[in-house]
């Protein structure tokens, strides 16, 4: 049984009503409920009486160090079997981290710990790592985004990676560890004992110099499946250093996120060699890089090669124009693996959209998710999209948010959605406005097709 409450300021009466449930439910989520240290006394008592609890989520509550201490004391019961604990954005500071080593030691069932958005600092991180190094700790997932960590935190983290095979997922994104810190962390990642599967280092101040170390890591660590390096200034030079590791026979990477990494069409050439050779790579994000139409052409040519089995490609905000759509269209008619294509925030216009729709209307196309938000689509472009919805049997999600579409365009789309042969399940229209007449027709459509969601 789950107790799941979000964004509700709990009155005294409501809190009294909930307390008995805290002692019974397997999953308790009280996110952004205005909880404070005073509530934590009750929470701790309730947790001691609940041997069934497997997940506790108290995100975005002003618990403070003292409140978190009370909650953790409640979990340190011999009968506690908690597996997932989320204390994200709970005002936990370095001063409150002293209890973490004993907590991790006493909770051998704990597998996930979320501490993001707490100012732990390097000193708090060191205390956390003491607990992670305990033989009784079997944590598998650790999230530490926005924790005010610096390069000084990387040696303790590297020690954990060298010492435990249990940890599978580590997120340290949005911390200023910099080039030097990433190099130290890489030493732990390269250790043979490290069995990490997911590493997230987004917006960590990495530079092209770090990519040589990362190359060695992805080449040698067959366990690594997901690598997130977004919002780091790697540049084309860094990508050139990284790609030989991705091409290694030992690399089994499935997901690679390189959004906003200062990559151009030149960097695409190196990545394309990886796409053509690595059937294991399934997801690639290059969003926010100035690839241009030339970069798009190179990617599409790679997606036509038999060695490429990519399933998801994000090229949002990549300085693409309608000129790239001929290459994208050809790829869509021949590629049978790509299921998701994110093209939002590119100046494709109605002419580009028309070309894409003609391709996707061909029999045998397999794309399921198409994102065209902020692509300068007008009511005229909706005519092509409406025809596509009737011709295509594979497309399930379409995002047209933030385009110049009004009643005429929306009505064309609704006309197709109303047809029994339309297979679309989700249409996203954020920042799109229509009249009450169109709204009435939309509500009637959702009532007659319960499997369809229109999100606006």
Curated annotation (Swiss-Prot):
Q: Does the keyword Endoplasmic reticulum apply?
A: no
- UniProt GO BP: cell migration; regulation of angiogenesis; regulation of Arp2/3 complex-mediated actin nucleation
Instruction: List the molecular function annotations (GO) for this entry.
Output: ribonuclease inhibitor activity
**Pfam families this protein is in?**
LRR_6, LRR_RI_capping
Name the keywords, alphabetized. Acetylation, Cytoplasm, Leucine-rich repeat, Nucleus, Phosphoprotein, Repeat
Location in the cell reads: Cytoplasm; Nucleus
N-acetylmethionine carried by residues? 1
Annotated PROSITE patterns? LRR (PS51450)
Q: Give the sites modified to Phosphoserine.
A: 86
Positions of LRR repeats = 15-43, 44-71, 72-100, 101-128, 129-157, 158-185, 186-214, 215-242, 243-271, 272-299, 300-328, 329-356, 357-385, 386-413, 414-442
Question: What InterPro entries has UniProt attached to this entry?
Answer: Leu-rich_rpt (IPR001611), Leu-rich_rpt_Cys-con_subtyp (IPR006553), LRR_dom_sf (IPR032675), LRR_RI_cap (IPR041302), NLRP_innate_immun_reg (IPR050637)
Looking up SUPFAM superfamilies in the UniProt record yields: RNI-like
One CC-aspect GO term: plasma membrane
**Which Gene3D superfamilies does this UniProt record tie to the protein?**
Ribonuclease Inhibitor
This protein's domain notes: The LRR domain forms a horseshoe-shaped structure that interacts tightly with target RNases via a large protein interaction surface on its interior side.
- Assembly and interaction partners: Forms high-affinity heterodimers with RNASE1, ANG and RNASE2.
Q: Sum up the protein's function in the record's words.
A: Ribonuclease inhibitor which inhibits RNASE1, RNASE2 and angiogenin (ANG). May play a role in redox homeostasis. Required to inhibit the cytotoxic tRNA ribonuclease activity of ANG in the cytoplasm in absence of stress. Relocates to the nucleus in response to stress, relieving inhibition of ANG in the cytoplasm, and inhibiting the angiogenic activity of ANG in the nucleus.
PANTHER family documented for this protein: NACHT, LRR AND PYD DOMAINS-CONTAINING PROTEIN 10, NACHT, LRR AND PYD DOMAINS-CONTAINING PROTEIN 12
In Swiss-Prot or TrEMBL terms, this protein is called Ribonuclease inhibitor
Give the organism the record lists.
Sus scrofa
